[in-house]
Amino acid sequence: METISITNRGSIRKFVDDVFIDTIENIYALCDLKISYYGVSIAYKNTGQLKKYKRGKILHNYLSNNELERINFFSVPDDFVTVAYDYLLSISINYKNNFMTATFDKNIINHECIEEIKTLLDTFMEKAYMQEIYTMDKEETPLLYAMGIKSDFKTIKILSSEAVKEDYV
């Protein structure tokens, strides 16, 4: 199954208010999806378990934790088997390694919304940063490419790669 990913590499702003969640939910809404699950990683804690998505105090506490290393959001169909391969949209924000990536199942992304999605993702980034848009097979795990862990992918196709600089007034 082919995916389209938008990956931003650079310093990520940390939000602890509703603006963070509103922005993430808006990206999902542009694809007519809702967040199903989320997962967090906090330094020195074993928090690798996925949780059913719900706005509220628990999620807010994770977001406001100074030790938050990364947070991932997933939308999956009702009949999913494995979140890692059955997601329709995954957004991963990695504060520890300074990148965020949104990976869309190619069948659900509305191509007219890509610019709006890029703008929403931009709100999380400190300028300047690098932005890449690429396609690849979901089974090759696009997150591994975004993390820079692996580079020998058979199906990757870079659509764009650019430096996003300060807006000068």
What are these model-derived regions, one by one?
Residues 18, 33, 47, 66, ...:
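Short linear motifs in intrinsically disordered/low-complexity regions
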Residues 21-88:
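N-terminal low-complexity, intrinsically disordered segments
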Residues 11, 15-19, 54, 108, ...:
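Alpha-helix boundary/N-cap detector
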Residues 1-41, 139-169:
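C-terminal interaction module
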Residues 1-7, 88-108:
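Glycine-rich, often proline-containing surface loops adjacent to acidic residues and nearby aromatics
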Residues 60, 65-99, 131-169:
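Aromatic/basic-lined ligand-recognition segments
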Residues 104-146:
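Surface-exposed beta-loop interaction hotspot
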Residues 3, 7, 23, 47, ...:
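Residue-identity detector for threonine
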